[in-house]
Each structure stands twice: as structure tokens, then as C-alpha cells.
Amino acid sequence: MIKKILVANRGEIAMRIFRTCRVMDISTVAVYTHVDRGALHVRYAEEAYCISNSPEDTSYLKPELILAIAKKTGAAIHPGYGFLSENADFARRCEEEGVIFIGPGADIIAKMGIKTEARKIMREAGLPIVPGTETPVQGIEEVKKVAKEVGYPIMVSSINSIYPLVSDSRTL
């Protein structure tokens, strides 16, 4: 059983995890930036470590520091939402260094980061998915063909991002 969790996140996301930990009698570790030093999640955690004097949120993306603190404190790492939660390399580093990563394994994170692969995995698992393609479309004509099959509106998406909602074939 996990006895201590470092939350590699901030604000309300960290607080939700910390509250759950308290109910489950699990010790908590916060990481924070200089700007967040007075934040509720920092005060609420049983231990707190400053990872940067930078005001930027990118400080929460410093895997070396977060791993070092997790090892020092003997904590598992909960990435929360965003930041490191979708970083397969970070999850893999945790695995390699013997630190428990609370979340999907690195291979799953990597696969779910590729939209067409994610759709395939979800379909095979019997999960409901919105109509679309499981292979990348090649050009506007193929997009129009898919749109005709599934109906408008559609969301046109690259593998790593999403483009605006398309209401009809004229806006393609």
C-alpha cells in the first residue's frame, strides 16, 4: 500500500488529491514554485518543497527535481492533470528509477497520445467513441468523404492538436 504521495501539480487539482489522501490516511508532499509558496495546496500538504523561483507554470514540468524529491521523501508520484500526466517519458523514468507513478503506464500514455491509436484501443475495449476515422486522413477530399459519412458538424484534428469545428463542406 502506498503510504505517501507527492502531487506534481498545483491548486485545486492538488487539493482534491490531498483531501482524498487525508481520508485514506496517506501522507502528502507538495511541490511548488516561489509564486505558489502561500497557496492552499502548499499549506495543506504535510511536506512541501520549492522546485523553482520562476513564476512560470513550466516549473511543474521539471522531472529531475520532482523525481529527486519523490526519492528523498519515499513518495509515489501523482501527476494530477496536465503537466506531467501525459508525459510517457516521465512515467517511464519513474518506472526505471523505482518510483511509483500513479496513472497509466508509459506505453499506454504514449499510445493514447496518438489519436488514431487511442480510438483503436477504445474501440477494441468496447468503449463508446464518436464517429470518425482510425487512420489518418490524407487530404481535403478524404475529409469531405468522412464528413459525408458521419455528418456535420465535424472536428478536424491533426494527430497532436484540434482545429475549429467545421459546420459544413464550404468551411473545409
Predicted regions and their residues:
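N-terminal beta-alpha lobe that positions the nucleotide/phosphoryl donor
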Residues: 1-172
